[in-house]
C-alpha cells in the first residue's frame, strides 16, 4: 500500500513534468529515463544508449492530403530495440508534442509500396492534434530500406523475421513502445489513458488493418486508406493488364488509353446528377457506359518525357509502383477495336480460362496505369512494359528468386496469374494477406474504424475495400439482415468511397473532386466525443469549387445530386450496390 507521502510525491512529479518546457524534457537524459525497462514487453529489449532527442520550434506545414496547415513545436526522439534471441535491431522515431500541447493522444503511421514507413511525412498530422506521431524501420536495416530489398536471405530462402515485422509486428511494437515512453516522458500515472490512433494509406492502409486484426486491444481508432490488403491478389493483379496485352498481342499508346479514359469520364460525369468533371457514381457508369462508343474517336497527343497516365495524375509519391516511365513521341490516330477489347477485358476483371472469377479490376474512369507500354524508337512501336510491383512480387515472394522483375510474360496466361495468387495465399496467408474478418477484439475494446478509398484509384481497386467491409459484416453479424447488420456495424466501422479520387490523393484527371484531409480530426471526435461521421467531411482542393467543403456518403449509400445539381443526398440503390458485390468462384476457400 502506498503512503500518503509517496502519492503526494508522485503527483508532484507529474505536475512538474506537465508544467515543464519542451527544452526541459527534450533531452537525451530525460528520454533515456522514460524508456520502458527491460521486461516491460516480453521479448523486447530497449537500447537506452541509442536514444537521441532534439527540440524543434515553430515548425510548420502547408498541409497535405491527410492534414491541414499548422505550426507546432515538438521533440524529435529516436531509439532502437531488439528481439531477444534474434540478433536484430529495430529503429523507431517519434515526434513528441511540447508538454503544454500534449492531449494524451498517440498516432502510429505507415508506409507505401514495399516501405514500412513514409519517413516523417505524416507526423505533422499527429502533433498538430496534440498526438505523439511515430514510425519504424521494421528492423529491415534503416528507415530507407524496403521489404523487397531484404525479403530473401538467399535464393529459395525467405526472411521470415522481415515478413512478420512488415506484416504486423513492427507497427504493433512501435505503438506499445511509444505509449509506454510517453507515460514517463510526460509524467503520467500508470492508469491514465492515452487515446491511440493509426493512420495510413495504400501499404499504410494494409498496415492499419493489420493492427485492427492483430492488436485490437491497443487502438481506439484506425484510418486504413485504400489498403493493399488481400496481398496475394493485390500484388499479382498488377500484372493482369500486361497479360491481357500479351494475350491480345496489342500494345496501345498512352494517348489511346487516355482518350478512352477521358471519354468514360465525360459520359459518366452527369450520371450522378451534376456535371462537374467528377465520376461520383462509378457503379452507374458500369451499368450504362459502353466502351464500344469510343471506337473510331480521334486522339492526338504531343510528345512527352514520360507517360501521361499513371501516378503523375496524383500528387502523392508512388505507393504501389507500376511500369517504369518512358518518353513518348507525338501520337495521333483513332481508337481501335483492339484497344476497346483490351479496355473491356481489363475492366471485366480476372477470370480463369474456364470462366471462374478470380479478382476485380479498377472502376471505370480510372487511368490504366498497369497497361502502360514503352516506346521503342528503333522499331517505332509500343511494347510490353511489365508492371514492376507485380513482377517483383512474383520473382522474389513466390518464386523466391532475387530478381527485380519478371524477364518476360511468355507462356503466362490468366490461369498462371490465378495460380500465383493461390500460391502467395498459401505462403503469406497469415502474414501479408491481412484479411482476417473477425474483428471481435477491436470491437470489444470500443475501437472505431474510418476507412476510405478513392473511387478512381488505379492502383488498388476500391472494390477491395467494399469486399472486405462485406466480409467483416457477414462474419460479425451472421444472422442479421443486410440493413440491420450494416447499421450495427456503422456504429464502429464506416467505409467512405471518395468520388473522383485517385490513389491516396486527389486526381488531376478529375480535379473538381473532393478529398478528405481531416480524417484524424473526424476520428478523434468520433472516439473521444461520440460524434458519429454520418458523412465524411472533405474539401475541394482544386478546380471550380476550390476551398469549399463537401460531404462523402458512407457505404452502402451512394451520392446523387438533386435540384439541378445544387444539393447532394445519399441514396440506397440496390442495382448500384450489386455492381460492387463479387463471387470469387475461382477459389476453393472463401476469399475475404
Locate the predicted segments by residue.
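Catalytic-loop region of hydrolases
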Residues: 15-104, 120-121, 288-407, 513-516, ...
Amino acid at each position: 500500500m502506498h503512503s500518503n507521502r509517496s502519492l503526494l510525491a508522485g503527483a508532484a512529479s507529474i505536475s512538474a513534468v506537465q508544467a515543464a518546457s519542451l527544452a526541459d524534457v527534450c533531452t537525451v537524459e530525460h528520454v533515456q529515463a522514460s524508456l520502458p525497462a527491460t521486461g516491460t514487453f516480453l521479448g523486447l529489449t530497449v537500447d537506452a544508449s541509442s536514444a537521441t532527442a532534439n527540440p524543434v520550434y515553430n515548425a510548420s506545414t502547408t498541409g497535405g492530403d491527410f492534414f491541414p496547415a499548422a505550426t507546432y513545436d515538438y521533440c524529435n526522439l529516436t531509439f532502437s530495440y531488439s528481439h531477444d534471441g534474434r540478433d536484430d535491431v529495430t529503429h523507431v522515431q517519434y515526434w513528441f508534442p511540447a508538454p503544454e500541447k500534449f492531449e494524451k493522444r498517440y498516432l502510429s503511421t505507415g508506409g507505401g509500396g514495399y516501405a514500412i514507413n513514409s519517413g516523417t511525412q505524416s507526423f505533422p498530422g499527429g502533433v498538430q492534434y496534440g498526438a505523439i506521431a511515430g514510425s519504424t524501420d521494421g528492423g529491415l536495416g534503416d528507415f530507407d530500406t524496403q521489404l523487397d530489398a531484404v525479403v530473401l536471405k538467399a535464393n529459395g530462402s525467405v526472411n521470415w523475421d522481415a515478413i512478420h515485422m512488415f506484416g504486423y509486428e513492427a507497427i504493433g511494437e512501435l505503438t506499445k513502445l511509444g505509449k509506454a515512453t510517453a507515460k514517463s516522458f510526460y509524467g503520467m500515472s500508470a492508469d491514465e489513458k492515452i487515446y491511440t490512433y493509426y493512420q495510413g494509406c495504400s501499404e499504410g492502409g494494409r498496415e492499419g488493418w493489420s493492427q485492427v486484426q492483430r492488436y485490437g486491444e491497443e487502438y481506439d481508432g484506425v484510418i486504413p486508406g485504400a489498403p493493399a490488403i488481400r496481398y496475394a491478389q493485390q500484388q499479382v493483379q498488377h500484372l493482369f493488364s500486361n497479360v491481357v496485352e500479351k494475350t491480345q498481342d496489342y500494345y496501345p499508346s498512352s494517348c489511346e488509353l487516355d482518350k478512352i479514359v477521358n471519354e468514360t469520364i465525360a459520359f459518366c460525369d452527369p450520371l450522378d446528377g451534376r456535371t462537374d468533371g467528377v465520376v461520383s457514381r462509378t457503379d452507374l457508369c458500369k451499368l450504362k457506359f459502353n466502351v464500344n462508343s469510343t471506337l473510331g474517336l480521334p486522339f492526338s497527343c504531343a510528345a512527352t518525357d514520360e507517360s501521361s497516365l499513371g501516378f503523375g495524375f496524383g500528387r502523392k509519391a508512388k505507393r504501389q509502383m507500376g511500369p517504369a516511365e518512358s518518353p513518348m513521341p507525338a501520337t495521333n490516330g483513332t481508337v481501335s477495336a483492339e484497344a476497346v477489347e483490351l479496355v473491356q477485358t481489363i475492366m471485366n476483371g480476372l477470370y480463369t480460362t474456364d470462366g471462374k472469377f478470380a479478382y476485380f479490376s479498377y472502376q471505370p474512369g480510372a487511368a490504366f496505369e498497369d497497361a502502360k507500354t514503352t516506346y521503342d524508337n528503333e522499331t517505332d512501336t509500343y511494347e510490353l512494359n511489365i508492371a514492376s510491383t507485380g513482377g517483383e512480387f512474383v520473382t522474389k515472394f513466390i518464386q523466391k528468386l532475387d530478381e527485380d522483375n519478371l524477364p518476360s510474360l511468355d507462356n503466362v496466361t490468366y490461369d498462371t496469374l490465378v495460380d500465383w495468387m493461390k500460391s502467395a495465399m498459401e505462403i503469406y496467408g497469415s502474414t501479408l494477406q491481412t484479411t482476417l474478418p473477425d474483428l471481435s477484439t477491436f470491437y470489444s475494446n470500443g475501437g472505431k474504424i474510418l476507412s476510405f478509398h478513392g473511387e478512381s484509384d488505379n492502383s488498388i481497386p476500391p472494390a477491395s475495400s467494399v469486399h472486405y467491409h462485406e466480409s467483416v459484416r457477414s462474419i460479425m453479424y451472421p444472422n442479421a439482415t443486410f440493413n440491420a447488420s450494416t447499421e450495427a456495424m456503422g456504429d464502429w466501422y464506416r467505409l467512405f468511397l471518395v468520388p473522383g479520387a485517385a490513389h491516396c490523393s486527389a486526381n488531376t484527371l478529375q480535379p473538381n473532386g473532393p478529398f478528405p484531409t481531416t480524417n484524424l480530426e473526424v476520428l478523434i471526435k468520433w472516439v473521444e466525443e461520440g460524434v458519429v461521421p454520418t458523412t465524411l467531411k472533405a474539401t475541394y482542393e482544386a478546380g471550380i469549387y476550390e476551398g469549399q467543403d463537401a460531404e462523402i456518403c458512407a457505404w452502402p449509400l451512394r451520392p446523387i445530386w438533386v435540384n439541378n445539381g445544387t444539393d447532394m443526398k445519399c441514396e440506397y440503390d440496390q442495382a448500384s450496390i450489386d455492381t460492387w458485390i463479387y463471387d470469387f468462384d475461382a477459389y476453393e476457400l472463401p476469399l475475404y
